[in-house]
Amino acid sequence: AFSYAETYRYYKTVNIYKFSREFSRHKYVPFLEAYTKAVGNNEYYEQVLRVITLLDKTDLKALPITTEKWYEIDDVQDLDIASALFADQPAERKKQYMRRYGGYWRFPGMLDFCYLVNPYFPSERMRDEMRANFDVLLTEYPSGMYVNSLLAGKCFNVQQHYMAVGNGAAELIKSLMEKAEGRLGVVYPTFEEYPNRIAKERIVAFTPQNRDLSYTVADLQHFFADKQISTLLLINPDNPSGNFISAPDVLLLAEWCRERGITLLLDESFVDFSTDWQTSSLLSDGILEAYPNLIVVKSISKSFGVPGLRLGIMASSNEDLIADIKRDVSIWNINSFAEFFMQIYNKYDKDYKRACEKFQEERARFAKACLLYTSPSPRDKRQS
């Protein structure tokens, strides 16, 4: 009988057959007729061949497929996948892939360099614990925001009432941007989820005029000083440029914003990939309380290696804002697997630190081996 535990041993058949007249007349067709009478018509015809091979020595041969492109189409989903695989023009093929925004396990041969995900976490120990609890997590409702904000606070050592948990950071970004008023300062190029959520005429864009798109706190202060913005978006490290500003300098920017009544929206989704990552985050009660104009957003997809869980957090000492975000999302906005990840994460905190260190080692090795220019360089200490 078929077993998913043994799929590595199975072959997938591309069903193009060539039978001799004698084989068809004396073996295949008689067995096919007997099989349909015994089992019915709504069965796979390959089963007939399987029965024949078990009962009789046959001279059936199979040709292994190597680089040939093929796809079996049984339903509308298969047709959609095949349309992407067999698109004639590269531009059309790219369009077919990009409109999916994920789900690329349907294309096993694809190498995805778009989404930066830590391949060294979760550790095998953590995966084992999640596998062991799969059945109960699959069949039980998750908790609501009260419990999940408590868990997120535990993971990041931040008070529960400063935290909101989202179905990915994207859910929180959508809710926040819909509530934002006034003009938004944005450094381009950027992660488009933020500016896409507000009217274009409300965006004040700053594009660094240099080769590596680098900028400092002083650059931001100089450009936005007279722009009358209500919110300044800082993605740090930036996506996609990689520009990085140290935590002390970000605090200088937070103070500058506070003096001018500007909200600093800080996205730290990639901060754990930075060289000094353990001292680069502003996720702490003390900092949040000192700067009530500061909002920190963090995706749990990237450095934690779990984009499929759809998990993100938002933190601020502006409790009215956090409470408003919590009311805006649905009662069960994350699933049981994402909740359980937060529930057990602290047991594997050391594994996570090792994974981040290993990621940095591999990045350095890769850059050296391929003679790549990285931005920012590990030695690049940008000052304000």
Tell me what each language-model feature is.
Residues 373-383:
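Conserved small/polar residues in nucleotide/adenosyl-binding loops
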Residues 12-16, 293-371:
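PLP-dependent aminotransferase class I/II
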Residues 215-226, 240-303:
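Active-site pre-lysine segment of PLP-dependent enzymes
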Residues 85-140, 227-228:
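N-terminal "arm"/small-domain region of PLP-dependent enzymes with the aminotransferase-like
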Residues 141-142, 153-175:
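Short loop-beta-helix segment that forms the pyridoxal 5′-phosphate
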Residues 50-63:
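Catalytic donor-sugar/metal-binding loop of nucleotide-sugar-dependent glycosyltransferases
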Residues 178-234:
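PLP-dependent aminotransferase-like
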Residues 1-39:
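Conserved core of the sugar-phosphate nucleotidyltransferase
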